[in-house]
Design a protein with these regions (language model features):
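Conserved small/polar residues in nucleotide/adenosyl-binding loops
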Residues: 179-186
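Conserved catalytic segments around the Walker B and adjacent sensor/switch elements
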Residues: 68-78
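A short, basic N-terminal segment
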Residues: 1-41
Length: 186
């Protein structure tokens, strides 16, 4: 059965290459509002939901609204890397020279985040998709990696996006459930 004809659709909205399509709903507006707030205040954000709920679509839409002269967006979905490979990849994506040793990668990542935020006056936005697969070693390191001036400054936005199991990994409770169609999404 051709559902495009049956439902009077002009195209198949479920294709992966249909990224220019965005259906604005109350829930999507709320997600975008909260992501905008995260961009303004900096720090860590978390976006979780069941597969197909529109996490990547919302992030893509949000990134399109960010001013390139004010934000440098780094997107990675390589959350299954070893910690050192993850940091080498992050250093490279930020535009820094990656190193072999973890402490060296920490240093260059922090230097690049500081350079971007202080010298270039750009807020680094680091988006880690599929973060539910990220190792606890990397998550534990984030507290150290994003500690600036004795934990008195936020130099970047870090958005972790993934399945609801990420909440359990982080041991967080859901503070605001934006939308659910059934109890299975809780």
């Amino acid at each position: 059965m051709d559902y495009t004809i049956r439902y009077g659709l002009e195209f198949n909205p479920f294709l992966k290459n249909s990224k220019e399509i965005f259906v604005s709903t109350d829930e999507s507006k709320e997600v975008l509002f909260r992501l905008d707030y995260l961009a303004k205040t900096k720090g860590f954000g978390l976006l979780t939901g069941s597969p197909g709920r529109g996490k990547a679509t919302a992030i893509r839409k949000w990134v399109q609204t960010l001013n390139n002269s004010q934000y440098k967006v780094v997107y990675t979905c390589f959350s299954t890397f070893s910690p050192n490979d993850f940091y080498r990849n992050l250093a490279t994506e930020l535009g820094a020279q990656a190193h072999y040793r973890k402490p060296d990668n920490f240093r260059v990542i922090q230097e690049e985040l500081t350079r971007l935020s202080v010298e270039k006056r750009k807020t680094p936005v680091i988006i880690i998709d599929e973060a539910n697969y990220i190792s606890s070693a990397i998550l534990n390191d984030f507290k150290l990696l994003f500690n600036f001036e004795m934990d008195s400054r936020d130099r970047a936005v870090v958005l972790l996006s993934g399945l609801p199991s990420l909440n359990a990994t982080l041991r967080l409770s859901v503070h605001c459930l934006l939308y659910t169609s059934d109890a299975a999404d809780d």
